[in-house]
Amino acid sequence: MSGWQETAEKLEMSWSNDVRWQGVERPYSGEEVVKLRGSLKIEYTLAKTGAEKLWKLLHEEDYVNALGAMTGGQAIQQVKAGLKAIYLSGWQVAADANLAGHMYPDQSLYPANSVPSVVKRINQALQRADQIQHLEGEGEVDYFAPIVADAEAGFGGQLNVFELMKAMIEAGASGVHFEDQLASEKKCGHLGGKVLIPTQTAIRNLVSARLAADVMGVPTILVARTDADAADLITSDIDPADQRFITGERTPEGFYRTNAGIEQAIARGLAYAPYADLIWCETSKPSLEEAKQFADAIHEKFPGKLLAYNCSPSFNWEANLDRATIETFQQELGKMGYKFQFVTLAGFHALNHSMFELAYGYKQRGMGAYSELQQAEFASEVKGYTATRHQREVGTGYFDQVAQTITGGTSSTTALTGSTEEAQFQK
């Protein structure tokens, strides 16, 4: 038996016997995967360990909740505060973190490698925080939190999905989600004008993403999102799975009208379940009743299937729910099987509101307002906050150690020694 065949057989045995792949269907063979790998095995440590960690969390925790991070610094603060995973939203990347350098709405207008770039940026920030902690010998924070990243509608067809998934893994993403919208007309799930692709086309995209992860040798968590609860357009009537929802009406662009709603979303969730690790139904309001309806329908056919839920800032929470329900909303979702829950645009709103409040106070009271921010930072240190000492936070001490190691401890140009931070911001 050749090494090629042996590797392929081991791969297929893992798919058959490993609990990780229970219920996951692949319409391709282990041999086909090995053919696409090339001769040199490359390890993707961050992506692999993160995916394994996230899978473990999803099965051991009541639920894993995350906030959308826009920057590496935001991700560090989330982990310091105790969150166990990071969410990376394409909406936020479009708004203020894409490689085009422009502000965009959530319509896939930015370069396709922008989200992988931010994944890499966040992982490098978390790595620096870990290096600082390791050097100082204090603290036990596990900074390498798994990142679940937004691949939107794949930025094209199945080959684009394949390449985008590879880029996500290379950057260190632990989980990636793909939605069933037409990439060229993609919209935020809470905007109008969304156009679905046929169910079988969406499944091919999921197969493509899984194939990419298998070729890379990484058990990436694959999340299938459907926008069918709100989307009332579809590109084609060719797929029998979609035909019962199509009204017969056409649009000027040639799209077909559909009966949007939870039944259409359930049908798609059921179709995607064998090809994804989690199913996410994008909703238009925070409704435990609708969440239960979707979960029950999925679990009737796929017991124990993991679900994801967007606790979106596009919802006016207090206009929809009372305070008591809001406080327990995530716990109730967790009981239904929504094991990954996230606030997509938390970073955007935290960044904008905190800066507006500071600027508003600063305009009125000058340094009094900034001093209050600084005092609030000092007060948060008992909770584990450390960015009050901003020089240390970004690694000045770490690079002082690099300099001392190079010079045998004789460097006279280290940065923290003699700094105002050393003099005025001691613990």
Curated annotation (Swiss-Prot):
Keywords: Glyoxylate bypass, Lyase, Magnesium, Metal-binding, Tricarboxylic acid cycle. Its cofactor is Mg(2+). Gene3D superfamilies: Phosphoenolpyruvate-binding domains. Substrate binds at residues 89-91, 189-190, 225, 310-314, 344. It catalyses: D-threo-isocitrate = glyoxylate + succinate. Its EC number is 4.1.3.1. The keyword tRNA-binding does not apply. It holds the Pfam family ICL. Mg(2+) binds at residue 150. The keyword Metal-binding applies. NCBIfam families: isocit_lyase, PRK15063.1. Homotetramer. Involved in the metabolic adaptation in response to environmental changes. Catalyzes the reversible formation of succinate and glyoxylate from isocitrate, a key step of the glyoxylate cycle, which operates as an anaplerotic route for replenishing the tricarboxylic acid cycle during growth on fatty acid substrates. PANTHER family: BIFUNCTIONAL GLYOXYLATE CYCLE PROTEIN, ISOCITRATE LYASE/MALATE SYNTHASE. This is Isocitrate lyase.
